[in-house]
């Protein structure tokens, strides 16, 4: 059995020595297949389903992220919004207006559950990489309304520090909106 080199609820390891140390200490690996290529960005395997002959991503990661979802623009100016994601099964999304006047929504790879410092660091690295890759600086932040989520705490702090609009979204509303966005994209 091959695994991505991380413990459950931990981010994918980017260093062979650390991966071996963590997997061996947990007693779940007999060997490690490594490589001398640097891992610049943590991408897990994508999970898809085929429905009526069409591939439907369940978890966007390798091969699907950060491909944009094309959404209708709400008005003449679609600001760059950074959606910070939930605590569990987290991703990040950035929007911008594309050349056709639609909103392009760039969704990050699956990051995992943001419950510890290592996973929050992976979340932060994914956010920085997404902003850098598309040369985008958020004009507004969106986060879950839950007061204890690390991503929401970060968004609230950044909104205060940089005087950015903050859009707090109820968790179940975000689920519905994401399903609708994927359905029309």
Residue ranges and their predicted role:
Residues 1-185:
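Acidic, glycine-enriched active-site microenvironments
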